[in-house]
């Protein structure tokens, strides 16, 4: 039984060329005998909420992606710098929300979930903001030889290793399922012009594109990177089904992310 990925993950081409198999351990699971596990997915940003924490239960790998919601949980997020805690109310089954605050860059946040006599926690530190200067476009040839138009994210990586990024594309208002992640291990302090190779939906001139850029912490990056490895989208694939890395304690799957956010909207040219 594993957390079936809701997204198809694509690591940026510049990162793919430099990767070596990670040493981090992932848990190999018996798909027939593993018990159901809590699945927690939540994010806060530097933009005022509302924010949502989604809590569900894992299902057998062979079943459809219909995750049973977890109701009646107590959910809080605490700013570890100023000590303020924020409660999340259950708006619908398994969906917990608040609009009480905006995250502060460089602050550490702790998520606590109490459900069915079990406590789950996660810690995420919100990085400083990196400005997405512009989005341009480049013609490329895909792995299957098809010509495609890709967005290029242009931004200045701050000096100092340990900067991690995630990008999400919306084309004509529709979110593209690919999630792109990037780290600055080989490009520290440089001006980045990163093409977002997208094999699930091709940009066309005249489309409306919204590109979101998130500055994420290492644990968030490792979650999506390990998910890419497990699903084979990074050029490496787990020998047997496994769960992606998580920053959650208590035996839960998923992730909690505190990140900064900015976006660019434009017409594809």
Regions found by a protein language model. Name each.
Residues 1-2, 269:
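Short, intrinsically disordered, low-complexity terminal/loop segments
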Residues 2-10:
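Bacterial N-terminal signal peptides that target proteins for export
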Residues 19-22:
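C-terminal motif of bacterial Sec signal peptides marking the signal peptidase cleavage site
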Residues 24-269:
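A sequence/structural signal for flexible, mid-protein segments enriched
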